[in-house]
Curated annotation (Swiss-Prot):
Residues 410-475 are annotated as: VHIID. It comes from Lotus japonicus (Lotus corniculatus var. japonicus). InterPro entries: TF_GRAS. It comes from the Eukaryota. This is GRAS family protein RAM1. The gene is RAM1. Pfam families: GRAS. Residues 309-692 form the GRAS domain.
Amino acid sequence: MINSMCGSSVSLKSENSRNKPQPTSPNESVLQSKKNATQSSADLEQTSLNLTPPSLNLPALKFDLDGDVEVQSPDSSMWESFFSDHLLDGDFMISSPVRNNVPSPQASTFNSNYNYAHQGIQSQSLSGCSPPRFSSPLGAFNSNKGKGLSPLHRVFNSPNNQYMQHVENLALPAIEEFLEEYQGDHGLGGGGGYSNSSNKVSSDIGSSSECFDMQNHIPSMLDSLTMQNSSRYCGSVSEDSSVHGGSSQLSQDSDFYHQMGSMASASLSQALQQERYQEKQQKQHQTQQQQQPQQQQQNLTVPIPIGMDQEQDSGLQLVHLLLACAEAVAKEEYMLARRYLHHLNRVVTPLGDSMQRVAACFTESLSARLAATLTTKPQSISNGTSMPRSSSSSCLSPFPSNSIEVLKIYQIVYQACPYVKFAHFTANQAIFEAFEAEERVHVIDLDILQGYQWPTFMQALAARPGGAPFLRITGVGPCIDSVRETGRCLTELAHSLRIPFEFHPVGEQLEDLKPHMFNRRVGEALAVNTVNRLHRVPGSHLGNLLSMIRDQAPNIVTLVEQEASHNGPYFLGRFLEALHYYSAIFDSLDATFPPESAQRAKVEQYIFAPEIRNIVACEGAERIERHERLEKWRKIMEGKGFRGVALSPNAVTQSRILLGLYSCDGYRLTEDKGCLLLGWQDRAIIAASAWRC
């Protein structure tokens, strides 16, 4: 999803302050401005521009040394493009661990009584190992000013959805027999995942107590959806000539939909009676071959809610169609899946509401999986059509993953949503506190990219009472040239801030790292930082990597990962979890950007759609988005000899301040055993934790 490429947006200038008192904390200007701020939301937004100390603001990427000597930053168009848009923007500095906590800003329009406990969403987990999310709401950010639940969330929270009510009995509707059939070599998931008990389906997975007949109701549901004449989000797999009987099947589909269309507006009982009558008539005029498409729809059990308004019902039916299509793909009922995709491609659009947009991404991903399955094995699916994957060398993105255009798209996410800022300054705060009073410090960044996380951290070290320590950063990345360029830029910044600095580049994949590459030195305090990166390390290499990190005896290890379970062994479970997770993200984008926003469309197309495609369409080594929940990471880290370190009250306070700077009230901050989770409404999105040996 969002990784360290998004980075910190900061101004890069220091100023000769010999005639000014030394700040006792790099966050002092933030704290003072917050003390004088009023409680209105307008004033809250005004303070967002005062978070960077005045001594660090400049209208250009220049570094002053002694007032009259000027050093121009290196000619790095990528850095200049990234930072130039944010020279006037504030950013979060790091609180000294000795400072007192500051209350969170609270706008007068906030309602602190907001509580989602009645929704019961915390019982949603396919793997059964999710922590009790959002059980300890923090501050004034549990407000009800945000959006209501999306159609997908209403599916999960509907009282009619019996299979969504209890975590120990969470069920995918009527698939237990299918899962049993795939216990052996025919499983559709897994492959390179982390080994633990969640890699097999729990026997607690059950089905709703009442069987729902898809044969009777899916056709009417299809016709009741609003047809759109806009261009399709992706090509329909039903038009693929590689599928046998394509033209004749389309004709049968048309007849089938026409025959069942009159049921759309009828009540449930009337629809059943009318269908039975039509079936009797069909038996007299149709052959057994024409009846097969109807017979293939048996045992697909997705409940259709009754009594909702038309808009909600349309969104819910769209969700049911996606689940039915995913189940057909999982059961290898390809002709039936083709028909669902044919209809989905007619009703979804990347320009509609959040439910339609996320459905468009999942529809395209299902099409890619089905198309590849019909021509080759899922393991060979590549991510190289209309949905680029920035992490794959085989993707056919309109521009390279490290181009200025992509960086600008990441910057849009960084500015519009708090997820990346939360990851960076929470990790930086933990590292800063672990380095207190240390004279020589060493940071190993396991995914340095452009190094955007570190300018604010370096500013904090420069403002430390007593002067900055000697700082060494080891940057790891797959491309040594890019890592070296990042080191050159950070070296220039450190020089402008008068920080003794050294950069050590390592051009390797994480699974290929060796202990000597860290260049560990005696007398240095060590921190290891990983933001949204460890989930991509193959399971067979993850244990060795963590053991090697532990042997380096770091003072602190900061781990930030997406709070989702996308590494289960079964395709249908991963699909449902991903649908829930990305629906929440698209909802947050919907509340952040204006309607018909071109920026939002770029974010969804080039950041989140490739992730969805990788989770849904790819298998084996090609499936790299293997997100795990915080509880799973706890087991992994503790199993390798690490113990958790509670994030400090300063981290909590600054997270509250961060959320107060965003106009949307849907963001939620919670604590879980010393860790912090940031989410949207009732769904956790990202989790931050700290560890020691």
